[in-house]
């Protein structure tokens, strides 16, 4: 404990790290305050029905991603999901369309162009979602809740919603560039964490008020299960398969280099949280197309987060996207070529093509159980709801919520660890190494 306190003190001794932490916290505070700023022209005292709607089904997830802004009719109500959806589409185009494939190979300049295309597509999605959100507001709120009416007000409110999401994107970029961690990921995480106390209090209140008794025991069981799910999720995020690599001995001057065995850590879940986000973004399309108010037909079936068909399709998409995103982020051919250039080889495997094939086969084998476990984590909240756990609390039993929390926390701690070790301070872990996960 004493060493941990000393490490915390060391964090604030490093001026650059201290400034980055303060800058990040200030921008996250701006985001949280903005989540409570209601759209101009709406009476904030009449949002009860909207908040009730935003606590059920897929809308509860959308509300959580926006930090409660969706249910507050806030200027940030559309959150970052349009940006995430646009990122998904652009990444898919980077595989299928030659122009975007070329941009991916152009390094930093290509990345900037890809980001620009992502922003353009985000605006297109916002132009579609803004009116849909306003239509939902008119359906859920009484006419007296609106101080202004008519087409011109809806246009004005849509522009404000678009501006709100663009401002969130700007905050995320500033945090990534000048703060600590991935900005968009931290913004999503803050929205999730902000809902956790309410979810726990709500579940505790429901259990303690049970007249039949046993509520306290059930609450304890739920918290214990949540703890073990959290630990299992950390194991999934951190799990690696170490591939031994031998480097040839080289003598430069009077010093000998190489000749020692090292390891390539291949992640069991190289795709991180992206497969679940991809799958959820697609599963939300029917809900978005129905104006956030799917009550019957195919849209209702595919929006029922506890339904059989929803979870079957959701789980299959998570597995498919895990393979897809792993193939995008892990390139065995490049790994084999880099290894060969540096005089490295896997014992018993020929350098070059054979090494690439070996790495590809290993990735395929470890991705299979990783994808199935990721799918189980994704649908765990649905099972929790079926067992009578409240919608808000059940969302923390797995899925995007838990993976984002674990992943973002580990990534941020890894950055802090790097700053400490670079300046010869003890890290946060005894080993001095804290593994993160793939960026979001």
Segments (PLM) and residue ranges:
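N-terminal cationic and glycine-rich segments that engage phosphates or anionic surfaces
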Residues: 1-104, 109-440
């Amino acid at each position: 404990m004493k060493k941990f306190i000393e490490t915390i003190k060391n964090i604030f001794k490093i001026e650059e790290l201290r400034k980055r932490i303060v800058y990040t916290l200030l921008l996250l505070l701006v985001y949280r305050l903005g989540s409570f700023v209601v759209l101009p022209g709406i009476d904030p005292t009449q949002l009860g029905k909207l908040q009730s709607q935003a606590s059920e089904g897929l809308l509860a997830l959308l509300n959580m991603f926006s930090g409660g802004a969706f249910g507050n009719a806030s200027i940030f109500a559309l959150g970052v999901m349009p940006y995430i959806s646009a990122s998904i589409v652009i990444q898919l185009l980077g595989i299928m369309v030659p122009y975007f494939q070329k941009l991916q190979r152009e390094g930093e300049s290509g990345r900037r162009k890809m980001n620009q295309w992502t922003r353009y597509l985000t605006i297109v999605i916002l132009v579609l979602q803004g009116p849909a959100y306003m239509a939902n507001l008119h359906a859920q709120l009484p006419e007296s809740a609106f101080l202004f009416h008519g087409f011109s007000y809806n246009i004005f409110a849509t522009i404000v919603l678009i501006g709100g999401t663009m401002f969130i994107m700007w905050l995320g970029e500033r945090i990534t560039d000048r703060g600590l961690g991935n900005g968009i990921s931290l913004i999503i995480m803050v929205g999730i964490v902000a809902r956790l106390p309410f979810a726990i209090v709500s579940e505790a209140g429901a259990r303690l008020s049970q007249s039949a008794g046993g509520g306290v025991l059930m609450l304890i069981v739920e918290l214990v299960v949540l703890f073990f799910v959290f630990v299992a999720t950390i194991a999934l995020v951190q799990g690696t398969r170490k591939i031994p690599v031998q480097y040839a001995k080289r003598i430069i001057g009077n010093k000998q280099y190489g000749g020692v065995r090292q390891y390539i850590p291949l992640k069991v879940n190289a795709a991180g949280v992206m497969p679940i986000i991809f799958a959820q973004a697609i599963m939300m399309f029917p809900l978005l197309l129905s104006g956030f108010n799917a009550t019957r037909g195919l849209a209702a079936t595919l929006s029922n987060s506890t339904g059989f068909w929803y979870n079957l399709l959701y789980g299959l998409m998570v597995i498919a996207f895990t393979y897809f995103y792993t193939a995008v982020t892990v390139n065995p051919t490049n790994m084999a070529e880099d290894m060969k250039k540096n005089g490295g080889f896997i014992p018993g495997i020929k350098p070059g093509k054979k090494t690439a094939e070996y790495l590809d086969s290993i990735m395929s084998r470890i991705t299979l159980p990783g994808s199935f476990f990721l799918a189980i984590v994704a649908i765990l909240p649905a099972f929790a709801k079926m067992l009578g756990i409240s919608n808000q609390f059940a969302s923390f039993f797995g899925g995007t919520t838990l993976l984002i929390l674990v992943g973002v926390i580990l990534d941020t701690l890894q950055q802090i660890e790097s700053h400490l070790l670079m300046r010869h301070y003890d890290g946060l872990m005894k080993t001095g190494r804290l593994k993160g996960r793939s960026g979001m």
